[in-house]
Amino acid sequence: MSDPAVPRRPTLDLRSFTPARVALGRSGASVPTRALLDFTLDHARARDAVHAVFDVPRLLADLGALGLAVTEARSRAADRRDYLRRPDLGRQLDAGSIEALARIASRPCQLAIVIGDGLSAAAVHAHAVALVTRLLPLLAADDAVALGHVVVASGARVALGDQIGAILGARMVVTLIGERPGLSAPDSLGAYLTFAPTPGRTDAERNCVSNIHHAGLSNDEAAFKIAWLLREGLAREVTGVALKDESADRAPRRIGTSLPE
């Protein structure tokens, strides 16, 4: 009699194409012990990612070493418990951060970058600085994009970047933020681009480059897509459903033009 805990390998083994839980086999009415233990471990890693401490000093130092003007901000979420129970507070800056950002907003800029912990500080620690490092040369190429401040924001939801971008007078804000951890990817980073950021923007007015992690979209690929969308968005003065990623087919339009060259 064959062992029911060991799945028979089909002609096309889907497990070689995806980390998803497929073809696990069975043991009686349940899955094999190994599969159950793997599930429990991945679930624990996802929970740990949500509650991980956000290492702001390390990020400020690493980004400052790249020659960037970096500052710190906080949302109105007082702690992690507050953040998880009140998503609305993660979209609003606290009073001290509003004052601090207003003091450094000397003149408008084309781009502000916000790096927020989101639902996975682990993702930000693993990928944010490396992604910014690869993005900077792409911003400096050709008609360079003028980068203003980089803001490291604690207790951040995606929409917090709208308020930050508005205070800094940025035409575009790119928010790099930890995505909700999955059972196969607890350290996935997302990048959200919003033209003319201001409080009240909807998700339909943003572009997202997601699934940035070692087993997903690489930092090089993500930086290329972000730079393309950023330049195209600035040229057309739009982001969201009206802006599609065509980076694989053509170069972005020159900023200040409305038609392809």
Swiss-Prot record:
Pfam family, one: EutC
Binding site for adenosylcob(III)alamin: V158, E179, C208
GO BP terms, alphabetized: amino acid metabolic process; ethanolamine catabolic process
Principal location class: other
Coiled-coil stretches: none
Annotated catalysed reactions: ethanolamine = acetaldehyde + NH4(+)
Protein name: Ethanolamine ammonia-lyase small subunit
Organism: Bradyrhizobium diazoefficiens (strain JCM 10833 / BCRC 13528 / IAM 13628 / NBRC 14792 / USDA 110)
